[in-house]
Amino acid sequence: MRRVSWSTVLIVVVMVSLFFVEHVVVPAAAGRVLTEKSGDGSATMTVEKMKSTVDSWFQRLASGPSPRGRGH
């Protein structure tokens, strides 16, 4: 009978562990579940503030062609 090397055993153990973690431990529906709309509208205000912040970041970006020269 042939002897099995430790590296082969290690690879099989890692693959079985990954399969177990992927299919048994982790099956979550979503990473973050959004809550229902609350009566005070705080979630809507947060989304609007986030949108305005991202818009202001995009406005700060330089527009036009890239500068020519070394490193570009």
From Swiss-Prot:
GO biological process: defense response to bacterium; immune response; innate immune response; regulation of root development
Induction: Induced by infection with the bacterial pathogen Pseudomonas syringae pv tomato strain DC3000 and the fungal pathogen Fusarium oxysporum conglutinans strain 699. Induced by the flagellin flg22, chitin elicitor and salicylate.
4-hydroxyproline: residues bearing it: 65, 67
Signal peptide: 1-30
Chief place of localization: secreted
Keywords per UniProt: Apoplast, Hydroxylation, Plant defense, Secreted, Signal
Tissue specificity comment: Expressed in guard cells, hydathodes, leaf trichomes, and vascular tissues of leaves and roots.
Free-text description of this protein's post-translational modifications in UniProt: Contains 4-hydroxyproline; hydroxylated on Pro-65 and Pro-67.
Function: Endogenous secreted peptide that acts as elicitor of immune response and positive regulator of defense response. Amplifies the immune response triggered by flg22, the active epitope of bacterial flagellin. Acts as a negative regulator of root growth.
Name listed for the protein in its UniProt record: PAMP-induced secreted peptide 1
Underlying gene: PIP1
